[in-house]
Design a protein with these regions (language model features):
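Flexible "arm" and connector segments at domain edges
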Residues: 1-46, 51-174, 178-254
Length: 254
């Protein structure tokens, strides 16, 4: 990387700020590779992500801030501090409680990236609160909270017409509902963002199959009524269930 910075004009002019989009993009591509289950692709994408780490380290080194050895050394020290039961005489404690003590956070959200996606942010906030004991005993607590929040959301939607009584209040209640769902995910060992990614992929897959079925009948979804579209949706779900019974495809999902 030092050689590239010296000899390549494009590499030479890059800064931490100009490299930000590439770092974010490479992280997403690693995530896609993991979801795809292809080890060769994952290997290549991890290399691209590592390149970004090296790039930022050399940029920092050039301005006398730190270098790659400093990055690696800080990581080793951090891992030792987080595992005192392995590398010291300390007892095993929760990751969040150790981080809070080490960094002496003054607020719950201190240190969380400003650009962290909302589902990830909710999960991390709840993890941090749990690290100091502010948490449900088990999944029954957040499950009851989800039911409570659904009722509060319904209070702002007219039961006859579906009209919204107070848009701002509804937004607040929907936020509470989403936060409760994330908490339920966390207490059951599911990451809300991954669960939603799975459902997004399922919806895209089923919608594409709907379009194919309609096209095979000489129709377009854009010209069909909702009832007709639902008929194709049900056909897709029935085909998936049939595929599951034969053991040749997707799992059964609603």
């Amino acid at each position: 990387m030092r050689d590239l910075r010296a000899r390549c004009e494009w590499d030479r002019v890059q800064t931490h700020q100009s490299l930000r989009p590439y770092l974010i993009e490479e992280a997403h591509e690693v995530d896609d590779a993991i979801a795809g289950g292809d080890d060769a692709v994952l290997r290549d994408e991890l290399g691209d992500l590592l390149l970004q780490v090296l790039f930022h380290s050399v940029v920092a080194e050039e301005r006398g801030a730190f270098g790659m050895h400093d990055v690696a050394g800080a990581l080793v020290a951090k891992m030792h501090a987080r595992h005192p039961h392995l590398y010291g005489d300390g007892i095993k404690r929760s990751w969040e409680s150790m981080k809070a003590q080490k960094t002496k956070r003054s607020t719950l959200e201190e240190g969380l990236p400003a650009g962290l996606p909302s589902l990830h942010r909710a999960h991390r906030l709840q993890d941090r609160a749990a690290g100091v004991g502010f948490d449900w005993d088990n999944a029954l607590g957040p499950l009851a909270k989800v039911r409570e929040e659904i009722a509060e959301v319904a209070h702002h939607v007219d039961a006859e017409t579906g009209a919204v009584h107070d848009q701002d209040a509804l937004e607040a209640e929907l936020g509470d509902l989403l936060f409760a769902v994330v908490n339920l995910c966390r207490k059951t060992g599911v990451h809300g963002a991954l669960a939603l990614d799975r459902t997004n992929a399922k919806f895209v897959r089923r919608y594409a199959l709907m379009e194919q079925l309609a096209a095979a009948d000489g129709k377009s979804l854009t010209t069909l009524s909702l009832d007709e579209q639902d008929t194709y949706w049900d056909r897709v779900k029935a085909a998936e269930r049939a595929g599951e019974s034969r053991g040749d495809g997707h799992t059964r999902e609603s």
